Design a protein with these regions (language model features):
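Short terminal hydrophobic/aromatic SLiMs and anchors at protein ends
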Residues: 3, 13-14, 30
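Serine residues within intrinsically disordered or low-complexity segments
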Residues: 4, 23, 27, 40-41
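A short aromatic-anchored loop/beta-hairpin motif
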Residues: 37, 42-230
Length: 230
C-alpha cells in the first residue's frame, strides 16, 4: 500500500473532526494526521509575538509537574494544529497490553490480529483507528492514520516498511487552548527520532526524553507521584 503525503493541518478538517457535538470522526482525522517532519533537538516556539506557528508534526511532552491523569507523563504526536481552530493528537507511549484481536467484536484480518493497541487519548475511546509510522532518511518520520481494517491489513500484507499500530481514543484542544497550556509550561515540545518506531521502547519514551533534557528534568522525572514518599 502506498501512503500518500498529506497536509500538516487544516482548519476545515479540525472542524469536521469536532462536529456532531465533538464526536470522533476517523475520516476527518485521516486527513489531519499525515505529516512529515525531521529530527532536531528540543525546542520551544515563540507564542507571544508574530504569527503563531503550527505545531503539527511535533511531539508534545508532558511537563513533570503535569498532574492531569489523562496526560501525566504522556508523549503525544500532534497530527493537526491550527491556531484558530485547535489541535488533534494521539498519545504514543501508553500501550494497553492488548492486541487488535482482543478488542474487536468481529474476527480481524489475520495480519492485524496481533497489532498492538495504545490508549491514544481521553476522547472517542469507543473508536479504534490504525496508524502507520514510517521513517524516511530524506524526509523524517511519516505518520498516516488508516480508518478501515482493509487498508491497514494491506500495509502489513505488502511488507511495507511502515510500523503499524492501533489507537483507542485521541486528544483534542479547542482554539487557543493548547497555546494557553504551553504558556503555563504544561508541555514541552520535541521533534522525534527514528526510535519512535521501536514500539518496545515507547513505554519508557517520556523518561528517556526527560533524561535527554538534562539533570533538572531527570530529577523532576524521578520524583514519586505521592510527595509524601520523597
Amino acid at each position: 500500500m502506498k501512503f500518500s503525503e498529506g497536509r500538516a493541518g487544516c482548519k476545515e478538517d479540525i472542524a469536521a473532526a469536532r462536529a456532531d457535538g465533538g464526536s470522533f470522526r476517523p475520516s476527518a482525522v485521516i486527513q489531519l494526521a499525515r505529516a512529515l517532519f525531521k529530527v532536531s533537538s528540543f525546542y520551544m516556539p515563540n507564542l507571544d509575538d508574530g504569527p503563531r506557528p503550527s505545531l503539527a508534526g511535533s511531539l508534545l511532552v508532558a511537563h513533570p509537574n503535569m498532574l492531569d491523569p489523562n496526560f501525566r507523563r504522556a508523549v503525544l504526536f500532534i497530527s493537526a494544529h491550527d491556531p484558530k481552530d485547535g489541535a488533534l493528537g494521539v498519545i504514543i507511549n501508553r500501550p494497553l497490553d492488548r492486541q487488535v484481536a482482543d478488542l474487536v467484536t468481529e474476527t480481524p484480518p489475520a495480519n492485524l490480529a496481533e497489532v498492538p493497541v495504545f490508549l491514544g487519548g481521553p476522547v472517542g475511546k469507543n473508536q479504534l483507528m490504525f496508524a502507520a509510522f514510517e521513517w524516511q532518511k530524506s524526509k523524517g518520520l511519516k505518520l498516516n492514520h488508516n480508518v478501515g481494517l482493509a487498508e491497514a491489513n494491506d500495509a502489513v500484507d505488502q511488507k511495507s516498511p511502515a510500523t503499524i499500530c492501533a489507537f483507542v481514543g485521541y486528544a483534542g484542544w479547542g482554539a487557543g487552548q493548547l497555546e494557553a497550556e504551553m504558556k503555563q509550561k504544561a508541555w514541552l515540545l520535541q521533534k522525534p527520532s527514528p526510535s519512535v518506531l521501536e514500539l518496545d521502547r515507547l513505554p519508557k519514551l517520556w523518561f528517556d526524553i526527560m533524561r535527554s533534557l538534562g539533570p533538572w528534568y531527570k530529577m523532576l522525572a524521578a520524583a514519586p507521584d505521592d510527595p509524601s514518599l520523597n
